[in-house]
Amino acid sequence: MNILKVFGMIFVLILASANLVKCEELNIYSHRQPFLINPFLEEFTKKTGITTNVIYSTKGLAQRLRSEGKNSPADVVLTVDIGRLYIYQDMDLLSVINSKKLSENIPEHLRSLDNTWFGLSKRARIIVTSKDRVKVGAISRIEDLADPRWAGKICTRPGSHVYSRALMSSLIAAHGLEEAEKWATGLVSNLARRPQGNDRAQVKAIYEGQCDIAIINNYYFGKLKYSDKEDQRTWARSLNLVFPNQGETDRGAHVNISGGGVAKYSKNKDSAIKLLEFLTDEFAQNLYGEINFEYPVNPKVEATSELQSWGSFKEDKLPILTIAKLSREAQKIIDRVGW
């Protein structure tokens, strides 16, 4: 009988150990490419012992999470663009998180009011101009791009892209629907070619003389500057950077975020919260800048020396959720003006 009790206790301990091991593993649904997030996850595992599995896709993860429901293996969602984060919130796919560290590390305007998603890094939407063909100081505000003096001089990616739509939303927030549409009409009138390609393609077009001015996310400049391809490094050397709307009374440059949240039906919420907290601490915040030239959301962490060398800038501190809420109106304007 004693032997049976001993074996029984051993069996219970084995089961308990198995459950503990199971809990020390996180499943991550990610819109971010593996090479961008793996260095973070490797360090997180070293620090905590919690291992991670990543399912990566550029689209369809929210729909997958919804269809899986309570049976979903997902613990953490990582994505880029406030519009995508808002989809997860709107579909009720994220857990409400109470974390003092997240509240301290992330400014209020870069996280959801209900604590379901959190900004993890920032990227500024900036203007780049040809060093040879546009004088320094000729453009200082995003609104300047609608000035007829730049007719036939501007290249952009399609207005329907999430980055363009977010910028459009920021202009609606700043000026209202009517003035924002006037700006979009002016911008389209100034385009040198049909909107096409990604931000890298706009820089190439400037170098090739197809246009003189473009709108890009700041990290594209870093990627080109340090590219292993000589031609792309040459493109970067042909540019001046303009952080728009920096005047003393102006609102600052439009920013977007990468961000994340804990899946609603996560079985490992405590570990999932630990990961989000880790991503807002100093080590990870610096890593965002070193790997992808993104700015820290944590106000206690300085931008990397490389980012600082591009110049300091003031950001538009509009609550980032406003960008997502105005997305539909922004798209309507984009469609009407043919951007």
Where would I find each of the regions flagged by the language model?
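A structural signal for short loop-to-beta-strand junctions that line the ligand-binding cleft
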Residues: 72-77, 95-127, 143, 153-155
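Short helix-loop capping/hinge motifs at secondary-structure junctions, enriched
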Residues: 132-140, 172-181, 266-272
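Extracellular/periplasmic juxtamembrane helices and adjacent flexible linkers that interface
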Residues: 278-339
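A bilobed periplasmic-binding-protein/Venus flytrap-type ligand-binding module shared by bacterial periplasmic
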Residues: 128-133, 255-268, 287-291
